[in-house]
A protein has these predicted regions:
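Membrane-embedded and interfacial regions of multi-pass energy-transducing membrane proteins
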Residues: 1-226
Length: 226
């Protein structure tokens, strides 16, 4: 444990772009925590889904804060995700460490699926449109679309399925993230100069300081948007 958390060797040349993975992990954890509390009061029914969210905002102590942390946090997840992905493409991480790259791509697809299903859950006018678009993407597979939507059109079974998938997928994401970290620590990190040097520094305290600064910066920015 010490070799992976404290004395883990990191390239000397890495910059702040290498902290985006940590920030992405923190925002995903924040999404899971706030999503659990939202799920406790959410009703997956066409007639009461929208009102259950407003009940959570108005009647639950600090419910408005949890709800907007969840919705604003999703924006930060995708901000850090695309910056993290762009950094990997820009510095050739996909060539240096392909196993880490492919495990990250799996994370990306699961995260996109989770976000699409979460977009449907409030079930206003735009949510109905989103559910219709998502299910129509599977129209080439009749048996699959009927299983996903629970019928021949978007209705209560569709919303229940999307809620269950949206609730379960983040925990599957945690499993893929462990796999992603395993490959990262097994094959080490890339660096901006793309050179294989043995001149490395321990993760703690040098890299930890940058990660901790980002950890403090996220809540400050997020609460500013609230």
């Amino acid at each position: 444990m010490k070799s992976h958390l404290q004395s883990y060797p990191c390239p000397l040349q890495i910059n702040s772009f290498w902290n985006l993975g940590f920030l992405l992990g923190i925002t995903i954890i924040l999404q899971i925590i706030t999503g659990i509390f939202l799920g406790l009061h959410y009703t997956s029914d066409l007639n009461s889904a929208y009102s259950s969210l407003f009940f959570f905002i108005r009647e639950i102590f600090y419910g408005w804060c949890l709800r907007y942390l969840h919705s604003s946090g999703a924006s930060f997840v995708f901000l850090f995700l695309f910056l993290h992905l762009g950094r990997a493409i820009s510095y050739g991480s996909y060539f240096y460490n392909p196993n880490t790259w492919f495990s990250g791509i799996l994370l990306f697809f699961f995260l996109m699926a989770t976000a699409f299903m979460g977009y449907v859950l409030p079930f206003g006018q735009m949510s109905f449109w989103g559910a219709t678009v998502i299910t129509n993407l599977l129209s080439s597979f009749p048996s699959l679309i009927e299983w996903v939507s629970g019928g021949h059109y978007v209705y209560n079974p569709t919303l229940k399925r999307f809620f269950i998938f949206h609730f379960l997928f983040p925990f599957l994401l945690c499993g893929f993230r462990i796999l992603h970290l395993f490959y990262l620590h097994f094959l080490s990190s890339n660096n901006p100069l793309r050179n294989s040097t043995n001149n490395k520094i321990p993760f703690f305290p040098f890299i930890f300081q940058k990660d901790f600064f980002g950890f403090i910066l996220i809540p400050a920015i997020c609460f500013n948007f609230l």
